[in-house]
A protein has these predicted regions:
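PP2C/PPM-type serine/threonine phosphatase catalytic domain
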Residues: 1-256
């Protein structure tokens, strides 16, 4: 498989940017034996105020990528080790700068191999797969939203109450340098197909509906990942949501 990638970001209505994202591509000529990683994409949405959130997301991306590249073993083993390194990076920063205590970040990291991919995520940053006209979220949502939706399904809350609940966007798990409460680590290789589009995003993307995200991908995917990423960010801006959060997208297109 051939992979093309683009990263785009918008600060939104915030006075600072707390998102971070990075990609790493394997050097040309990397042997195909075993389970070689061709592309690694990671996105982090920081929290903890102007300085803390930005520091946290940068540390998470940097620590995750460095450990994954260095680590040996299966993709699953490497992703787990990289997540632990990212979590350790937060702990180390807080140890030497106690004023940063309370900072943290979401994380979604995806390793792309020759014909499949693997991921790990913590928090609420979504990972989408667009394939043949349909889009699905692949990773778990570690915010309170799924909990509230279960309460709606059981009749204990109305949909309106769930939508208005102030806890809706609270995180049940995040990379904060302590034990991780919830981790979504893909259990088996996820087969890739030519013309797949994979999107990692921070939760600012939720200012537009999933059906709109899918429509944009369908309209722009043949123009490449940069055009698709630009269109997604433009749609978020055009939504003009009050107090718009930072939005970052990493768009990966898969070719034969």
């Amino acid at each position: 498989m051939r992979f093309e990638v683009a990263i785009r970001a918008s600060q939104g209505a915030r006075s600072y940017q707390e998102d971070a994202a990075s990609v790493w591509s394997a050097p040309e000529g990397t042997p195909a034996a075993g389970e070689p990683t061709r592309l690694l994409a990671v996105l982090a949405d920081g929290m903890g105020g102007h300085a803390g959130g930005a520091i946290a997301s940068d540390a998470v991306c940097t620590g995750f990528e460095a450990q994954y590249i260095e680590q040996q073993g299966s993709a699953r083993q490497r992703l787990k080790a990289a997540l632990n390194a990212a979590n350790g990076a937060i702990s180390a920063l807080v140890a030497v700068q106690p004023q940063l205590r309370g900072m943290g970040s979401t994380l979604v990291g995806v390793a792309f191999h020759d014909d499949h991919a693997s991921w790990v995520s913590v928090g609420d940053s979504p990972l989408y797969l667009y394939r043949r006209g349909e889009m699905a979220r692949l990773n778990e949502d570690h915010s309170m939203a799924p909990v509230l939706e279960k309460l709606v399904a059981s009749g204990r809350l109305t949909p309106e109450e769930a939508d208005d609940d102030p806890r809706r966007h609270m995180l049940r798990s995040a990379v904060v340098g302590e034990d991780l409460d919830l981790v979504d680590l893909s259990q088996s290789p996820w087969p890739l197909q030519s013309e797949d589009v994979v999107v990692l995003a921070s939760d600012g993307i939720h200012s537009i509906a999933d059906i709109e995200i899918a429509r944009i991908i369908a309209a722009y995917r043949k123009d490449g990942p940069a055009a698709t990423a630009d269109a997604l960010i433009a749609a978020v801006r055009e939504a003009n949501v009050p107090h718009q959060d930072n939005t970052t997208v990493v768009v990966v297109t898969v070719g034969a």
